[in-house]
């Protein structure tokens, strides 16, 4: 197959591993910076141009779209879809997962376990938001944050009210969520490919930190999932319509709770912790499922 990897940095671990996996399995692969693409929107022959070259003949696309360029990345993916190219991550699925509020609404509708969450545009009484999630301590999350950025732990009522007021003054959209004490600073990353969890790891925050993201100094080790955790991760990915996803769970007294469904999960942490060839599993999935698409088909999920 001729495969395009949409990535702004070919030196990133995940991009390098996907290139290696494609090459080792005999595919032609190119890394394309989406910000250097420009789109020819025409009903007869939609096209994408890249640094003066018309992109043609691709069988499949692997989007690795950073959060900061989601809007333009979605436009490029949609254009590939209009051209009939198979996209591992569909535009609809990517858009759902990047909108944290929409993602939680979809997961809630499917009956998937979630932390108690409240959201508002302009609440004059912060105490009402706090009451909805069961009081303090609680977690406040900017809707646009990634990799643990834009997340604050408020341990007291006064602290929570102050942060809510600050976010409101900035006109920032944010979520208020209950703090799951029994998770003890750990979460579980489930890596889903297709309809299977192919790897899982437990991430633990460093001392003095409540966010377990590896980008923030957290550590990771292999963990065994319960059948319920496995089913929850798969159902969460399918709800978003994602064929490849990193589903983050908290282990709580009422069962697994989904924190986030990541549409562009990093490979370095999960491959290092588990020793598995995740990049190879992703390419193998594409080999079995990549088929030309039509512009009339609806996104899954």
From Swiss-Prot:
GO terms for molecular function: ATP binding; metal ion binding; ribosomal S6-glutamic acid ligase activity. One of its GO terms (biological process) is translation. InterPro entries: ATP-grasp, ATP-grasp_RimK-type, ATP_grasp_subdomain_1, RimK, Rimk_N, Rp_bS6_RimK/Lys_biosynth_LsyX. Residues 104-287 form the ATP-grasp domain. Mg(2+) 1 binds at residues 248, 260. SUPFAM superfamilies: Glutathione synthetase ATP-binding domain-like (SSF56059). Its cofactor is Mg(2+); Mn(2+). Mg(2+) 2 binds at residues 260, 262. Its EC number is 6.3.2.-. ATP binds at residues 141, 178-179, 187, 211-213. Keywords: ATP-binding, Ligase, Magnesium, Manganese, Metal-binding, Nucleotide-binding, Protein biosynthesis. Mn(2+) 1 binds at residues 248, 260. Mn(2+) 2 binds at residues 260, 262. One of its GO terms (cellular component) is cytoplasm. Binds 2 magnesium or manganese ions per subunit. It holds the Pfam family Rimk_N. Belongs to the RimK family. This is Probable alpha-L-glutamate ligase. It comes from Cellvibrio japonicus (strain Ueda107) (Pseudomonas fluorescens subsp. cellulosa). The gene is rimK.
